[in-house]
Each structure stands twice: as C-alpha cells, then as structure tokens.
C-alpha cells in the first residue's frame, strides 16, 4: 500500500543518502499554490508507479519540507518504508519543473533500487553515480518522460548540482574526460553526473569518469 501521497515535515529525520554533498539555503522561498499543486500531482503519480517496483513488504512516501531553505533531497530507509525527503530550497528552485522533479525523485529512489556498486559492503544504498544511472535508465522512463523532457530535466538538475557545489555548469555537447582508476563511491563531478544520466537514458556503459571495472 501507499503510506501517503504527500507528507509535509517540519523537522529533519535521519539521513542515509543525499543527491548533494552539501546544502545551501535559498535567500527567499517562494513556493506558489500552482507549484504545490504540481508537486502534489507529481508525488501521487510517482508513488503509485514506483510502488510496483518495490519489494512487497515495502512502502514509499515522499516527504516535503517547503519551509526549509536547503537545496537538497535525501532518501531514508526506515525498516520497510522508503522515504524520500525534498527540502523547500529544491522545490522552489527556478530550474525545478515536473520533469526535473521526477528525475530528482528517481535519483533518490535509485539509492534503494539502483543496485551495485553500493556505497559500502554492508549497506543498502547505491552510489551517487549508480543512482544517477538508474534514474535515467529505468525510473523516468516508467514515469512516461520523453527524450526531450529528459534532456531538459537532466541539464536543469545537474545545473542545480553545479550551482550548489560551485562547479561550472555542465554541457550536453561535452564530456568529462577524467578516467577513474577506481570506482568513485562519493559524488562525481557535475559534468560526469550529466554524462551518467545521458548514458543511462541511452543504455550505454557507465562513464569512466566515475565507474571502474
């Protein structure tokens, strides 16, 4: 069953995996009623579709904290509940739209369903790179996102990542030339993350800028 289509939380809960290594705060939060309706519709559809992908003894919930200025999102595994938390700074970011919001939720889900490589040998969370790959290879396609919407969403979401981590904005027409000598279990460079999303969408090999085999 679906625990809840929309849960607003005003306090932080235990963190297991976040889409960004750090958070910055928006100077001003401006979440309009239209944005809230968009989020409600997106969350309900996401939970309904994603529930079918989870083990039968697990539930999914998206928790929103619209008053918190942090620009970030996190996933927490609470026994049989997979809870995705999205903070207000991310919700109200100018680059956030239905497709980029879906891609963000899919990335967080990817920490649970993305598979190896995992962040630790005894943990359950896929690495950031693997979560990015899963989000594009599987999850957003299940949600009916088309290629044009995906490209815009991938560029928008990684531009937010670049802004928060103070990196150059990633570009579709270039690739990260780095070659990893071992798998990156942390946060790849923003251009590498965009490359990973594109590779996932095209079902191509995971980029060498973070993945080593």
Predicted regions and their residues:
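Sec-dependent signal peptide recognition
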Residues: 1-9
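Long alpha-helical scaffolds
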Residues: 3, 70-74, 106, 131, ...
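N-terminal signal peptide c-region/cleavage motif recognized by signal peptidases
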Residues: 12-14
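C-terminal capping/extension segments of zinc metalloprotease domains
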Residues: 17-94, 140-213
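Soluble non-cytosolic domains of exported or imported proteins
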Residues: 33, 37-41, 95-100, 122-129
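Solvent-exposed, polar/charged alpha-helical surfaces in well-ordered, non-transmembrane soluble domains
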Residues: 44, 48, 103, 129-133, ...
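Short alpha-helix carrying the canonical HExxH Zn2+-binding catalytic motif
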Residues: 97-110
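Catalytic Zn2+-binding segment of zinc metalloproteases
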Residues: 109-124, 137-144
